[in-house]
Amino acid sequence: MTEARLTHLKQLEAESIHIIREVAAEFDNPVMLYSIGKDSAVMLHLAMKAFYPGKPPFPLMHVDTGWKFKEMITFRDEMVSKLGLELIVHQNQEGVEQGIGPFTHGSSKHTDVMKTQGLKQALDKYGFDAAFGGARRDEEKSRAKERVYSFRDKQHRWDPKNQRPELWNIYNGKVNKGESIRVFPLSNWTELDIWQYIYLESIPIVPLYFSEKRPVVERDGTLIMVDDERMPLNGEVPEMKSVRFRTLGCYPLTGAVESEAATLPEIIQEMLLTKSSERQGRMIDHDSSGSMEEKKKQGYF
């Protein structure tokens, strides 16, 4: 890596740490959403740096849909135990009782009930007035126009036409009772920045990001990993292929990519050559045109 790249990463690091500290100082009850992916790993690492040698003055929270990869849950529990942090795990029990799932109800219904409604339940239950998320502007077009401090009304809705100006590094965190802010410290990072920072800082990540022989089936041009017995195969026979994941979510809704990149330098080299978005493997993004923006308007992160 060049000195210029290191300087660029350090500038991003400083900006993110400033945002995290600003929120901790300004809000009464913040929380950090921990989705266990690479962006969450970087955001958590930055939070640990921001308050070192102390611990972050806010809990982590994972909205568990019940369909995450098994390796993700194992990694989550190991990291929280290792760092000695408070973790809140919330699940939409109404959705569980109704048997809501991606195979039985489809990706849109599953995402709305188990993720969006589950998140809103948790924010209301604990009274959080600010929630950190690991979204980046380069990921998807609706996220590209979102502010670092993203205002949400009392129903947790986002109005893209009613956003506050953000001049330089000045953020407006004023909220009334019941309103909240979603905060995105990684807004100005790219996928390549994330991977180079993970390499530079030796940040632990879920092994699913590295290429390995895994059982997959191909559906509508997408490779889906068979992670447990709940996946209906309909006569399909899983193939063992060398795949990895560029993004992680519920396993039935997350496509793998064929890859031989089994180390961080190999992943970085792959990122330098790729021309496709990391979210091409997220099936929820393909529900309909503009589906991510519509989800965010209803409270999705």
Curated annotation (Swiss-Prot):
Its EC number is 2.7.7.4. One of its GO terms (molecular function) is ATP binding. CDD domains: Sulfate_adenylyltransferase_2. Heterodimer composed of CysD, the smaller subunit, and CysN. The gene is cysD. The keyword Cell wall biogenesis/degradation does not apply. Belongs to the PAPS reductase family. CysD subfamily. Keywords: ATP-binding, Nucleotide-binding, Nucleotidyltransferase, Transferase. GO terms for biological process: hydrogen sulfide biosynthetic process; sulfate assimilation. With CysN forms the ATP sulfurylase (ATPS) that catalyzes the adenylation of sulfate producing adenosine 5'-phosphosulfate (APS) and diphosphate, the first enzymatic step in sulfur assimilation pathway. APS synthesis involves the formation of a high-energy phosphoric-sulfuric acid anhydride bond driven by GTP hydrolysis by CysN coupled to ATP hydrolysis by CysD. Residues 279-301 are annotated as: Disordered. It catalyses: sulfate + ATP + H(+) = adenosine 5'-phosphosulfate + diphosphate. InterPro entries: PAPS_reduct_dom, Rossmann-like_a/b/a_fold, SO4_adenylTrfase_ssu, Sulfate_adenylyltrnsfr_sub2. It comes from Marinomonas sp. (strain MWYL1). Pathway: Sulfur metabolism; hydrogen sulfide biosynthesis; sulfite from sulfate: step 1/3. This is Sulfate adenylyltransferase subunit 2. SUPFAM superfamilies: Adenine nucleotide alpha hydrolases-like.
